[in-house]
């Protein structure tokens, strides 16, 4: 998780980051680099500007960073290009090994670095809170954080009040790529966390063997009411083809009520695999519509 600010004086913000370090960040840093596109987006939503970011800031988030240095792919950013941008503050991912490996080099060079880990709306809200402390733009925390939370709370309350029976809250979450289809549990994925937050029962949480080996027999036995699929990778059509192949190769899957009755949902990658950030309420709204579909 992302620690809340512990204390701050007039010029700095002190907080515990996602890898357990106490960091002291100067307010309003002049040259900021984000090692993930989603974190670049959060920093800009907090009123900040960027001197460098990973490629997905442009490709997946469509951010306008004309003067910023493109440091390469999110999983393998170039340390050389990052340093060439002369950052005084680097926003890094605790769950990306290459980012964590850069820590010692950045610290040795006197470059402030803070690590974040965002898998849920609450994680996003905590990160935005810290970033708006650093930019001194708490108005943007209200606008891009608390206002979104109010919308999400309303959607969750509406779902809870609809008294969906337990068997209709049973879900299977699949992640499809061009070369595989895997079941995912509630933790560690955007859609998994959202389904859990809405009060759904993910069959992979109680049957962990599903996570290691996609057992068609277990899926048939559990009979999920909804099946949600998120695609990953750049080739969405190839990922969808992987899913189609799985169903063709395992005809028993076609006998599931969820498949027969239109409750197999292929979800938008932008809103349910990447981090939706300011669009999180939109994601919850779409999910609500799917979950209440008979």
Q: What name fits each language-model region?
A:
Residues 125-133, 139-142, 229-294:
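Structured C-terminal subdomain patch of bacterial secreted/periplasmic proteins
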Residues 79-92, 111, 216-229:
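Proline-aspartate-enriched helix->loop->beta-strand connector
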Residues 17-20, 68-80, 207-216:
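Short helix-initiation/N-cap motifs at beta->coil->alpha
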Residues 23-28, 62-70, 198-208:
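A local structural motif
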Residues 57-59, 182-212:
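Alpha-helical, coiled-coil/dimerization segments enriched in small aliphatic residues
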Residues 1-38, 138-174, 231, 289-294:
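Bacterial Sec-exported substrate-binding components of ABC uptake systems
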Residues 98-101, 117-130, 169-190:
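Extracytoplasmic ligand-binding site segments that recognize negatively charged/polar headgroups
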Residues 35-85, 89-96:
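A short, structured surface patch at a secondary-structure boundary
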């Amino acid at each position: 998780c992302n620690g809340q600010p512990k204390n701050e004086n007039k010029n700095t913000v002190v907080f515990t980051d996602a890898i357990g370090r106490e960091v002291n960040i100067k307010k309003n840093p002049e040259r900021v680099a984000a090692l993930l596109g989603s974190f670049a987006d959060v920093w800009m939503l907090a009123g900040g500007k960027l001197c460098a970011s990973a490629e997905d800031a442009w490709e997946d988030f469509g951010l306008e960073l004309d003067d910023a240095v493109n440091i390469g792919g999110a999983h393998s950013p170039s340390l050389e290009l990052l340093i060439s941008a002369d950052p005084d503050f680097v926003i890094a991912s605790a769950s990306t090994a290459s980012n964590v490996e850069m820590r010692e080099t950045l610290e040795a060079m006197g470059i402030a670095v803070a690590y974040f880990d965002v898998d849920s709306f609450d994680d996003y809200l905590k990160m935005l809170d810290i970033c708006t402390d650093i930019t001194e733009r708490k108005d943007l925390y209200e606008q891009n954080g608390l206002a979104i939370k109010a919308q999400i709370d309303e959607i969750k309350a509406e779902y809870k009040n609809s008294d969906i029976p337990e068997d209709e809250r049973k879900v299977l979450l699949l992640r499809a790529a061009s070369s595989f289809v895997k079941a995912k549990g509630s933790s560690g994925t955007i859609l998994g966390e959202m389904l859990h937050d809405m009060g759904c029962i993910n069959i992979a949480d109680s049957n962990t063997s599903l996570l290691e080996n996609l057992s068609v027999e277990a899926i048939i036995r559990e009979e999920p009411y909804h099946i949600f699929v998120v695609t990953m990778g750049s080739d969405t059509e190839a990922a969808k083809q992987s899913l189609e192949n799985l169903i063709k190769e395992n005809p028993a899957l076609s006998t599931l009520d969820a498949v027969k009755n239109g409750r197999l949902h292929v979800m938008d990658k932008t809103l349910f695999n990447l981090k939706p950030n300011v669009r999180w309420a939109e994601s919850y709204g779409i999910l609500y519509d799917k979950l209440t579909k008979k």
